[in-house]
Amino acid sequence: MEPDAMTETPTELGTADIMRVMELLPHRYPFLLVDRITAINGDDSCIGIKNVTINEPQFTGHFPAMPVFPGVLLVEGMAQTAGAICCAHKLQNNTKPSRVYLMTIDKVKFRKPVVPGDTVEYHMKKVSNRRFMWWFRGEAKVNGVLVAEAEIGAMLVTE
């Protein structure tokens, strides 16, 4: 990871319901994987929430007899939560909006299956950033139990 190139003081931005999440993120159904944000701490950290329900399209094939939320979608949910940190940072600093592109995924581990009825918490923390590249470390938890973890790199591209 690159050393932190910015020395801004994080500002508590609070929470975001689904309407605010849709202002921060460009994703939409069926690929919006963050239902709400319970904490945004400036450009430092964020907790996103995903309520997993049986009526989501991936469960028609993954797996019909024993539905399991796909691990790749857990990683995408972590990436979207990290993206909310980037977008909130841009809004807070009145800078031009950016698209956030996933660039790297490292050290991914899936610990336990996630099933319909679970509420996933995505705990994302910025590790560092340099110019347009930001790096995050994240965990996905259900009822406080670690179900997945990853390190994610993202690039901000001005629109």
Curated annotation (Swiss-Prot):
One of its GO terms (biological process) is fatty acid biosynthetic process. The keyword Cytoplasm applies. CDD domains: FabZ (cd01288). Its main location: cytoplasm. It is found in: Cytoplasm. It catalyses: a (3R)-hydroxyacyl-[ACP] = a (2E)-enoyl-[ACP] + H2O. Belongs to the thioester dehydratase family. FabZ subfamily. Pfam families: FabA. It comes from the Bacteria. It is an enzyme of class 4 (lyase). The active site is at residue 62. The keyword Cytoplasm applies. The gene is fabZ. This is 3-hydroxyacyl-[acyl-carrier-protein] dehydratase FabZ. One of its GO terms (cellular component) is cytoplasm. Involved in unsaturated fatty acids biosynthesis. Catalyzes the dehydration of short chain beta-hydroxyacyl-ACPs and long chain saturated and unsaturated beta-hydroxyacyl-ACPs. Transmembrane segments: none annotated. SUPFAM superfamilies: Thioesterase/thiol ester dehydrase-isomerase.
